[in-house]
Amino acid sequence: AESASSSESSSSESTSEGKKFEARYRVDKNGGGTLSVGNDTGNSSVTYTVTDPDKSITVTAVPAEGHVFVKWSDGLTSKTRTDTDFKQNLDVTAVFGTASVPNPSEGKGAVGSSYTFKAALSGKYAKTENLRWYANGQEVTQAAGKSSITVVVDSSMVNASYKIHAVVTYNDCKVSSNTLTITIGSGVTS
């Protein structure tokens, strides 16, 4: 039988052995959020020295109030990223955008009257098609994607109060409006 050489395995060791790489994560200069790594939250930048190329680093971009996470500067669009298999330095920036959903503050109504709710979205990442409406915590599915909804008050709604709010979502980030509370009266005035 031929004897296979047993020395070949030693030459295939990792070529990046002994090299150091730097992994740097930053928040875009316009701000709008922070970075968190495990329980370490609220960072504007985090830097790691990577001596083991198989090391894995997980960083999450956390949008501030009224902001959504847009993307990482290298094109990744999920707010949590895990980098491993380092062959070179990494330097990425988390980009955030503003999004807000203003809402009217209060309303009262009676049977037969109707309400119109409008969400005046602001910020280029607040898109109408990503808008969802909720009444008392339940999504109003037929209102999805509409910036204006009209509700006609019927007798089943008398003496009830409804909390209405709108949420716009972008890349898994949710921005909510204020909650509008409506109280429906019977319409009978004494």
Residue ranges and their predicted role:
Residues 1-19, 188-190:
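Ser/Thr/Gly/Pro-rich low-complexity, disordered linker/stalk segments of secreted
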Residues 48-53, 107-113:
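Short, solvent-exposed loop/linker segments at the N-terminal edge
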Residues 97-106, 189-190:
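Proline-enriched interdomain boundary motifs that mark the N-terminal boundary
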Residues 1-3, 17-27, 81-98, 164-166:
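Conserved "repeat-terminator" motif of extracellular CCP/Sushi domains
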Residues 44-48, 57, 79-84, 90-92, ...:
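Short strand-edge motifs at loop-to-beta-strand transitions and within beta-strands
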Residues 38-67, 85-88, 158:
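Extracellular modular ligand-binding repeats in secreted and cell-surface proteins
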